[in-house]
């Protein structure tokens, strides 16, 4: 019994790839789709180029480090404490910002929880406010249009009245 369980736990390495290739009795599977081929053809050279750039950057970094190491060793009594102070200051600022963002988001969540509003309710409220505002703006536009029309008619009557007097003279 123990031998049977022990044999079941072992897998042959070839078993992991069985699902990738069709067996002799199975129907032949179509090749990759056109979009997959285009993705590979496009991304393979791009990935190779980026890998080349990464290698060049790494080599340049190593060369620069090899050339500047003697200067760092000579100036280390000054540079090491300065680097530690700058590193601690940057860490402090980043930590402060992270704690601030965490605190604000926590307070915001607590406020929403205490109000008992959920996102769908907030969306519905915003939708209603937008509709009310649109209706209010439409009403104002109608009123303004009527006012402009009335003033235009008044101006037209005034001009007609003035022209009539000029013709008489």
Swiss-Prot record:
UniProt GO BP: lipid storage; response to freezing; seed oilbody biogenesis
Matches recorded under Pfam families: Oleosin
Subcellular location: Lipid droplet; Membrane
Tissues expressing the protein: Expressed in seeds (at protein level).
Motif Proline-knot, residue range(s) on this chain: 70-81
UniProt keyword Transferase present: no
CC per GO annotation: membrane; monolayer-surrounded lipid storage body
Basic and acidic residues bias (residue ranges): 122-131, 160-169
PANTHER family in the record: OLEOSIN (PTHR33203), OLEOSIN 20.3 KDA (PTHR33203:SF44)
Family: Belongs to the oleosin family.
Protein name: Oleosin Cor a 15
Lineage: Eukaryota, Viridiplantae, Streptophyta, Embryophyta, Tracheophyta
